A protein has these predicted regions:
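Aromatic/hydrophobic beta-strand junction motif of beta-rich domains
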Residues: 122, 224-232, 336
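Accessory beta-strand-rich segments of carbohydrate-active enzymes
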Residues: 5-8, 12, 20, 57-63, ...
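Conserved, mostly hydrophobic/aromatic
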Residues: 56, 135, 200, 300, ...
């Protein structure tokens, strides 16, 4: 172990730094009149929608009362802390952030409100939101990473309508989930952001419409299982396309219960009431199913007609499991074939947009570049990304390990991070029911996190490329990992679980998951599959492409040439020989630099790729 490198990696806050104004090529080319105009939800897509991104009025106040005047305009969906928002102002925990814009309802639309609804969607708002229309409360939402929606229909009037949003964000001053955000940025923790940070849109739907559905591909049986939640009931038509060829087209005037041994192309159960409306289930048989792989990421097109509601989606036929190889070593398997996962850690930060990518093509660039560098997996690190990022992973063929977002009150970094780095074995003897140690004294905070964890699985369940759920990372806000693993397994039986990435292993889940930045890489024998869920972290600051002069990383190099040689040597001489010994996955830190943490393969502005 290099104690000097270890000591230099101690995290320090530098909130008074003035960060360099780095921009990406997509941010430089951004047209404020056409911001992120792609349909934001590719797996439940409708035609009749309106994107509400663009300029809104905003105000930052000390009072919770709606302002009579506004401070200016903000470019949605960029948070006010970001360059692209045009505001560049940190929202404090004791402040309110207000948004306002108009919505115009035509006489024709207003006259037909008895037969249709107008649904408003927020991709994500950090952290607590109050939505009002024409001064009337529509809904509230807490949680900065998950989408929410509201039915505007009862609040509409003909002509101009005023849509407003009030936001508060405690960031790391509370137990709420916040990931890497901190009000005192520095080291491996980054600038806090707030407010709207994903696309806002609205869509007209018929009175009876599809609310959501769950898609489960049974790779072994060649079946797609659909569970659909609806408002109201109506005839259903389901179509599946393999490229342009329709391989299933079934219509139902009235739902029928499935038989135990159904021989037809599909079966649909009787609709039955549930708290969210009606529930319908279908089994679709996929003839000669074409498997999804990282080399051939084939996606089937799914079209569902529910009365007058028409939606389009997609799915893939694949399975993710952990199985023993011919030597009895547990391995990660894609479609029952062992696959070594060469992964990279992705923080999901941008210099000009912070949490918000400046364009859809920026997502594509990151994913394609990582594939070109030889990676077949991305670990999305304690952030939930916009739905289109997952769509691009699905279609481009890269596997995703999805972290839950960390939260909890303040915890001791020396005890939670530094000590386990120096003495890894010590963390295995600490139980995570010591709530105070891990910043989880608040029962309300623990319950809130559990709900968010299960809601995250609910939201991302249909994503074909997501292979593994990661509830906890390095003990940050960790608690009751054994119980949480059981809850996740009950919610989703189709994906393995990395119960505690890094340390504070409670012995559960499907992986023995280790972080190793300062010791010689090795394999730890365990009954579970062994993964290096973080390693590397080599730092190389590129002049003109870094946020600050300061360097944070785990081993420092002065030039791209030095970095490249060390990086290749790490992969070829230390990492690859471990695969035969039992290593089944490894996650290199990281995809890009973030602020002073310059251990990315790409610079923060994505303009320089360091490996040569």
């Amino acid at each position: 172990m290099d104690l000097f490198d270890c000591a230099r990696s101690i995290n320090k806050s530098h909130e008074n730094d003035v960060l360099a104004r780095l921009t990406t090529v997509w941010g430089e080319e951004l047209d404020p009149e056409h911001v992120l105009e792609e349909y934001p939800r590719p797996q439940l897509k409708r035609d009749n929608f309106t994107i509400l991104n663009g300029y809104w009025r905003y105000a930052i106040t000390r009072s919770g009362d709606m302002p009579t005047t506004y401070d200016g305009t903000i470019l949605v969906p960029f948070s006010p802390e970001s360059i692209l928002s045009g505001v560049e102002r940190q929202l404090q925990p004791d402040e309110y952030l207000w948004y306002e814009r108009g919505i115009f309802i035509t006489a024709e639309d207003y006259a037909s409100l008895s037969s249709k609804k107008l649904i408003l969607h927020f991709g994500a708002v950090d952290q607590t939101a109050l939505v009002c229309l024409n001064g009337r409360k529509v809904c509230t939402h807490t949680g900065g990473y998950l989408p929410f929606e509201a039915d505007l229909t009862p609040f509409l009037r003909e002509g101009c309508n005023s849509l407003s949003l009030r936001v508060r964000d405690a960031s790391d001053a509370s137990y709420h989930s916040r990931g890497k955000q901190t009000l005192k940025r520095g080291g491996m923790f980054y600038t806090a952001q707030s407010g709207i940070w994903q696309t806002v849109w609205m869509e007209w739907v018929p009175k009876n419409y599809i609310r959501k559905f769950y898609l489960t591909s049974d790779y072994d049986k060649g079946e797609l299982h659909i569970r659909m939640l609806t408002h109201g009931t109506a005839p259903v038509r389901i179509q599946v396309f393999e490229e342009s060829n329709c391989i299933c087209d079934d219509s139902y005037k009235e739902p029928v219960p499935p038989k135990k041994k159904e021989s037809s192309a599909s079966a649909l159960s009787a609709a039955k009431r549930n708290p969210e409306g009606y529930s319908l289930s279908a089994i679709i048989r996929i003839p000669k199913a074409r498997p999804w792989t990282t080399e051939d990421p084939f996606l089937y097109t799914l079209k569902i007609q529910f009365g007058d509601d028409h939606v389009e989606s997609y799915f893939a036929m694949r399975s993710f499991t952990v199985e023993p190889d011919e030597k009895g070593i547990p391995r990660f398997c894609l479609n029952h074939s062992p696959l070594f996962l060469h992964g990279v850690l992705d923080q999901g930060y941008w210099p000009d947009g912070l949490y918000t990518a400046p364009s859809d093509q920026a997502f594509v660039y990151d994913i394609r570049t990582m594939k070109e560098l030889g990676f077949n997996m991305i670990r999305k690190h304690i952030k939930i990304e916009a739905a289109r990022w997952y769509y691009h992973c699905d279609r481009l063929g890269i596997i995703v390990w999805q972290d839950m977002v960390s939260g909890g009150s303040s915890y001791s970094l020396p005890l939670v991070c530094y000590l386990p780095t120096l003495i890894p074995d010590i963390s295995g003897h600490l139980k995570d029911n010591n709530y105070k140690l891990f910043g989880r004294s608040s029962k309300k905070g623990r319950n809130e996190w559990i709900k968010e964890c299960l809601d995250t699985i609910d939201y991302l369940y249909n994503v074909p490329s997501i292979a593994v759920w990661v509830p906890f990372n390095e003990g940050w806000g960790q608690f009751d990992a054994g119980r949480i693993t059981k809850l996740i397994r009950k919610k989703d039986k189709t994906r393995p679980i990395d119960q505690a990435s890094g340390w504070f292993d409670q012995g559960g889940g499907d992986f023995k998951s280790v972080h190793n930045y300062f010791r010689k890489l090795d394999v730890v024998k365990d009954h579970r599959a062994f993964v290096l869920s973080e390693y590397g972290g080599y730092a190389c600051r590129i002049e003109g492409h870094s946020s600050v002069e300061r360097i944070y990383g785990y081993k420092k190099f002065s030039t791209k040439e030095e970095f490249s040689k060390a990086y290749r040597r790490l992969l070829d001489t230390e990492l690859k020989p471990l695969i035969e010994k039992g290593l089944c996955a490894a996650v290199y830190t990281q995809l890009s630099d973030v602020e002073e943490e310059v251990n990315g393969l790409l610079t923060y502005d994505r303009k320089v790729c360091k490996p040569q």
